Amino acid sequence: MAHVSVPMYWRTIPQRYRLVGSKCKKCGSVNFPPKGVCKYCNASSEFDDVQLSGRGKVHTFVLISAGGAPPEFAEQEKAGGQYPVAIVQLEEGPKVIGQMADADPKEVKIDMAVTTELRKIYTEEGVIRYGFKFVPARK
């Protein structure tokens, strides 16, 4: 089972719960999750926090089937069978990975408009871990 230490878990709450990224003061690119050095210009370590919209489009995706998920997702796998995991290009630029929810795996498509919602990700040692999942955008 994957283990995330309590201090690391608490440090990443702004990214996991509120989609807070960092905007490079030199090149203006948005990094998510925030980095110590800009991953685009590699020259700046000065950033401003930026609230990401949570809106984007599916860049690519994969369907996770039985046996393909880490142990902490076994309960979800048993309950629902296959589930999609997508790399989404957010409106602000960064690409982020996350599970899809409320979407028939057969209907997930490249360029599909999605938004983020705070959802239960998994339970580890009796602690429920929350984070964002992507859902189809409402029209």
Question: What name fits each language-model region?
Answer:
Residues R18-G21, K35:
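Residues immediately within or flanking Cys/His clusters that coordinate Zn2+
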Residues D102, E117-K139:
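OB-fold/S1-family single-stranded nucleic acid-binding modules
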Residues M1, S22-K25, L63:
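Hydrophobic small-molecule pocket/channel-lining residues, especially in calycin-type beta-barrels
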Residues K23-K26, V37-A43:
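Short, cysteine/histidine-rich loop/knuckle motifs that typically chelate Zn2+
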Residues M1-L19:
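Flexible extramembrane loops and terminal tails that flank transmembrane helices
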Residues D48-E107:
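Extended interfacial segments that mediate partner engagement and assembly in macromolecular machines
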Residues F32, E46-F47:
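Short functional micro-motifs and their immediate structural scaffolds
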